[in-house]
């Protein structure tokens, strides 16, 4: 339980698109997008494993579309930047192994219904959404700024600003909080893969000059003299990506969401179409939580939605302000149930989730980035919530 009073520290991490687990996530979502572009009703559960010189694709897919899996895999790896055997992973030469089956008929009969509105949930489980007023995008400050650093690491590598970085990297930001509010950045950790010829001094200078200062100085939370900065603290990070660690789809679920602030139901997102409530339910929960905060009903909101496989209506819904709202949680929950239809078909329709948009979600967070495709980041329901709550 995060305290609401006194001084404490909270930390969140992010990784770059070259991190092996994120390579896997991007491949899984690339396969999903290729199929949705041809058949919006594709049922996709695509898992990826990447290791030295190899990618393995497995899962269950039912679709009228076609995906050239070796091409999809290699294009994804090329776009990330693994273009040399020296990195242990080269898009031109890596092996691609696939084992794809159709969706289980037993699962399909629980999802498919005579009328679309009665579409059942694709699985049981609980999903969480979270929002707070710590940043303009209504995300917790630690994960928001950690993602900003990771994105910057990739940006300066790809645009040529820094020529010694390689694709793999991680960032971490620790905030000091006082009475539940972020007041300053206490420490920053950055690890970036680099060329063998790069010196530690050059790496530290490049990270501070081109990554940390441009991102964190405008934040209002960063004073370099009062902040501990840790950069490549092993002294060497040449071996990275899938050569350094095996990567798997769905192993970065905390940095995909809220950086540990708020709960997580355990289900991963990448490689799954919208009939999987692990993904669509979590997106809807974020949409609800963000609209509650945007409405002014609470400065902090967490939403839990739970489903039973084959059943359209959720088995439970909880909306909590964690004691920050002027109205009871019961009132918030009732308002949410009045404004939002939480059956899977209606979630998919409201958020327009049958589009090939998921490649953009697979790195730097599924939430808190207000891209045109990210409908779950819209705050168009805020006024309706205020009306339903009668405030």
Curated annotation (Swiss-Prot):
<dbReference type="GO" id="GO:0006556">
    <property type="term" value="P:S-adenosylmethionine biosynthetic process"/>
</dbReference>
<dbReference type="InterPro" id="IPR022628">
    <property type="entry name" value="S-AdoMet_synt_N"/>
</dbReference>
<keyword id="KW-0554">One-carbon metabolism</keyword>
<keyword id="KW-0067">ATP-binding</keyword>
<feature type="binding site" description="in other chain">
    <location>
        <begin position="168"/>
        <end position="170"/>
    </location>
    <ligand>
        <name>ATP</name>
    </ligand>
</feature>
<keyword id="KW-0963">Cytoplasm</keyword>
<feature type="binding site">
    <location>
        <position position="245"/>
    </location>
    <ligand>
        <name>L-methionine</name>
    </ligand>
</feature>
<dbReference type="Pfam" id="PF02773">
    <property type="entry name" value="S-AdoMet_synt_C"/>
</dbReference>
<feature type="binding site" description="in other chain">
    <location>
        <position position="19"/>
    </location>
    <ligand>
        <name>ATP</name>
    </ligand>
</feature>
<feature type="binding site">
    <location>
        <position position="47"/>
    </location>
    <ligand>
        <name>K(+)</name>
    </ligand>
</feature>
<comment type="subunit">
    <text>Homotetramer; dimer of dimers.</text>
</comment>
<feature type="binding site" description="in other chain">
    <location>
        <begin position="236"/>
        <end position="237"/>
    </location>
    <ligand>
        <name>ATP</name>
    </ligand>
</feature>
<dbReference type="GO" id="GO:0005524">
    <property type="term" value="F:ATP binding"/>
</dbReference>
<keyword id="KW-0460">Magnesium</keyword>
<dbReference type="InterPro" id="IPR022636">
    <property type="entry name" value="S-AdoMet_synthetase_sfam"/>
</dbReference>
<dbReference type="GO" id="GO:0000287">
    <property type="term" value="F:magnesium ion binding"/>
</dbReference>
<feature type="binding site" description="in other chain">
    <location>
        <position position="60"/>
    </location>
    <ligand>
        <name>L-methionine</name>
    </ligand>
</feature>
<comment type="similarity">
    <text>Belongs to the AdoMet synthase family.</text>
</comment>
<dbReference type="InterPro" id="IPR022631">
    <property type="entry name" value="ADOMET_SYNTHASE_CS"/>
</dbReference>
<dbReference type="Pfam" id="PF00438">
    <property type="entry name" value="S-AdoMet_synt_N"/>
</dbReference>
<dbReference type="GO" id="GO:0005737">
    <property type="term" value="C:cytoplasm"/>
</dbReference>
<dbReference type="InterPro" id="IPR022630">
    <property type="entry name" value="S-AdoMet_synt_C"/>
</dbReference>
<feature type="region of interest" description="Flexible loop">
    <location>
        <begin position="103"/>
        <end position="113"/>
    </location>
</feature>
<dbReference type="GO" id="GO:0004478">
    <property type="term" value="F:methionine adenosyltransferase activity"/>
</dbReference>
<feature type="binding site" description="in other chain">
    <location>
        <position position="103"/>
    </location>
    <ligand>
        <name>L-methionine</name>
    </ligand>
</feature>
<feature type="binding site">
    <location>
        <position position="268"/>
    </location>
    <ligand>
        <name>ATP</name>
    </ligand>
</feature>
<feature type="binding site" description="in other chain">
    <location>
        <begin position="251"/>
        <end position="252"/>
    </location>
    <ligand>
        <name>ATP</name>
    </ligand>
</feature>
<dbReference type="InterPro" id="IPR022629">
    <property type="entry name" value="S-AdoMet_synt_central"/>
</dbReference>
<keyword id="KW-0630">Potassium</keyword>
<comment type="function">
    <text>Catalyzes the formation of S-adenosylmethionine (AdoMet) from methionine and ATP. The overall synthetic reaction is composed of two sequential steps, AdoMet formation and the subsequent tripolyphosphate hydrolysis which occurs prior to release of AdoMet from the enzyme.</text>
</comment>
<dbReference type="InterPro" id="IPR002133">
    <property type="entry name" value="S-AdoMet_synthetase"/>
</dbReference>
<dbReference type="GO" id="GO:0006730">
    <property type="term" value="P:one-carbon metabolic process"/>
</dbReference>
<comment type="pathway">
    <text>Amino-acid biosynthesis; S-adenosyl-L-methionine biosynthesis; S-adenosyl-L-methionine from L-methionine: step 1/1.</text>
</comment>
<keyword id="KW-0547">Nucleotide-binding</keyword>
<feature type="binding site">
    <location>
        <position position="21"/>
    </location>
    <ligand>
        <name>Mg(2+)</name>
    </ligand>
</feature>
<keyword id="KW-0808">Transferase</keyword>
<feature type="binding site" description="in other chain">
    <location>
        <position position="276"/>
    </location>
    <ligand>
        <name>L-methionine</name>
    </ligand>
</feature>
<dbReference type="Pfam" id="PF02772">
    <property type="entry name" value="S-AdoMet_synt_M"/>
</dbReference>
<feature type="binding site">
    <location>
        <position position="245"/>
    </location>
    <ligand>
        <name>ATP</name>
    </ligand>
</feature>
<keyword id="KW-0479">Metal-binding</keyword>
<feature type="binding site">
    <location>
        <position position="272"/>
    </location>
    <ligand>
        <name>ATP</name>
    </ligand>
</feature>
<protein>
    <recommendedName>
        <fullName>S-adenosylmethionine synthase</fullName>
        <ecNumber>2.5.1.6</ecNumber>
    </recommendedName>
</protein>
């Amino acid at each position: 339980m995060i305290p609401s009073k006194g001084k404490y520290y909270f930390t969140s991490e992010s990784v770059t698109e070259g991190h092996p687990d994120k390579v896997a996530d991007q491949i899984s979502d690339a396969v999903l997008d290729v199929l949705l572009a041809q058949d919006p009703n594709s049922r996709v559960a695509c898992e990826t494993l990447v290791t030295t010189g190899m990618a393995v694709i497995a899962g269950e897919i039912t679709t009228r579309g076609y995906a050239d899996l070796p091409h999809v895999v290699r294009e994804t790896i090329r776009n990330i930047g693994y273009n040399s055997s020296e990195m242990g992973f080269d898009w031109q030469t890596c092996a691609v192994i696939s084992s794809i089956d159709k969706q289980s008929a037993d699962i399909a009969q629980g999802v498919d219904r005579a009328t679309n509105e009665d579409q059942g949930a694709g699985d049981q489980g609980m999903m969480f959404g979270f929002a707070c007023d710590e940043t303009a995008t209504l995300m917790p400050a630690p994960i928001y700024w950690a993602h900003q650093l990771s994105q910057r690491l990739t940006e300066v590598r790809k645009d040529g600003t820094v020529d010694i970085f390689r694709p793999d990297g991680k960032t971490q930001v620790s905030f000091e909080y006082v009475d539940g509010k972020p007041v300053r950045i206490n420490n920053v950790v950055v690890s970036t893969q680099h060329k063998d010829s790069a010196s530690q001094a050059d790496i530290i200078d490049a990270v501070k000059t081109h990554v940390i200062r441009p991102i964190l100085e405008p934040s209002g939370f960063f004073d370099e003299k009062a902040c501990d900065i840790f950069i490549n603290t092993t002294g060497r990070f040449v071996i990275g990506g899938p050569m350094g660690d095996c990567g798997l789809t769905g192993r970065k679920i905390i940095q995909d969401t809220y950086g540990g602030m708020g709960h997580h139901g355990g289900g991963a997102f990448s490689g799954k179409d919208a009939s999987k409530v692990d993904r669509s339910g979590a997106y809807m929960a974020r949409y609800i939580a963000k609209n509650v905060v945007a409405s002014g009903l609470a400065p902090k909101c967490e939403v839990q939605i739970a489903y039973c496989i084959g059943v359209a209506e959720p088995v439970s819904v909880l909306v909590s302000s964690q004691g920050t709202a002027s109205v009871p949680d019961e009132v918030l929950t009732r308002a949410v149930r009045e404004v939002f239809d939480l059956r899977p078909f209606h979630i998919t329709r409201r958020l327009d989730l049958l589009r090939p948009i998921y490649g953009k979600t697979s790195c730097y967070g599924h939430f808190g980035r207000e891209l045109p495709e990210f409908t779950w980041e819209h705050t168009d329901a805020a006024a309706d919530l205020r009306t339903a709550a009668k405030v």
